[in-house]
Amino acid sequence: MDEARYLCNRSTEHENGIIIKPFIMKHFFTSALLCLSIAGAMNAQELANFNFGGRQKPVISPEIQNDSVTFRLKADYATVVKLSGSWMPNPWGGTIDMQRGENNVWEVKIPLPEPEIYTYNFVVDGVAVNDPQNVYVQRDGTRYLPMLIVPGERTENYGEATKHGTVSHPWYHSELLGMDRRLTVYTPYGYEANPKKKYPVLYLLHGAGGDEEAWTSMGRTAQILDNLIEKGLAEPMIVVMPNGNANQAAARTLGIPEKPMQMRWDRDAIAKMSEAERDLLMNGYVRSLCTEIVPFIEKNFRAIPKPASRAIAGLSMGGGHTISASVLYPELFDYICPLSAAGDATPEQLAALKKAGVKLYFLACGNTDFLFQRAEDMHAKLNELGFPHEYFVSDGGHVWSNWRLYLNTFAQKLFK
């Protein structure tokens, strides 16, 4: 698709204010058009074999070829260069040595991993370095990491669809948390063209270390929903992704000062609090979500204001928030999806939720996730109560590859 159109449609906030002087402009655009013409006419392999008249060939990285992928980095003065990738058995320490080649371009070819979205980086003389040839990156907290997208059935909904929804960043005022706070909101294709149509809403919550952009960056929410809706596999819906850090107004990349955090494990301080203060400390964000964000969305977007048209899902910390929201406000959401959840509920709370009526309770976790036992315990608790639910156990751990899979799965079950 047209990359310029993609950037305008997906993001309006990350723009570079670069001024190019007039006498440079002509040469800049001539060079740019030449590069685009060459790149547009050739694939990576053809470009690598192109005769550049004695000049150095451009460095292509990563380069997928049938059943392998090659990574390259030009590093003239390096002595040791390694590759680290999330497909490795130990991605937080495992590395592969790269070999120095012609013109000090370091290279390594590996078997093509299974279809999925991976992140990677180079380690140059002990220092982590991103791939300067790869413009496709994900932001995970404060880190930007290059992406490797391996095509296949698993990733077919992670790329761009033909018809695109819109991602915006409205702000709402929170009286409970004492600040204006930023949201990420996805509206489906056709939302602007059909001003009388109303939509159901999925409230999608991130985990610890994330923010309101985590699900669109690491989770590929816009791409997954675009594809599912275009294929008729999911109902057109609005997706609201709040910032789950109660002391933050927005993602740290915006540079907005944060409030000092009150530690939940400071027992002496908690003992001196009133009941209302303790509740605000423990449940302030969840109460803001249910009593401030939901009304804000239903006032400012064309959202259907009914429990049957509201869903809530979240990963890890956000899974805990999902469980808390569902038991504190049992009549608010008819679709509840805790994913790798760091949270729990009492049998009494779950019984009240069951009585209120739930159309779908979708519980998911990886079988090597450090929170897997919690998921097992919740599954057993729901069974003991005769609480109808779906329990999805996947391979793998506490990772985005699982959370993308869960979103791709449960989104097809909502609002039907």
For the regions a protein language model found, what residue spans apply to each?
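Generic short amphipathic/hydrophobic targeting helices enriched at N-termini
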Residues: H14-N16, I20-K21, L34
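Acidic, Ala/Val/Gly-enriched low-complexity intrinsically disordered segments
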Residues: D2-A4, E13-E15
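Non-catalytic cap/lid and distal C-terminal segments of serine-dependent acyl enzymes
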Residues: E46-G53, V59-T95, Q99-K416
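Positively charged n-region of N-terminal signal peptides that target proteins for export
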Residues: K21-F28
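Bacterial N-terminal signal peptides
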Residues: S31-G40
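Boundary at the C-terminal end of the N-terminal hydrophobic targeting segment
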Residues: M42-A44
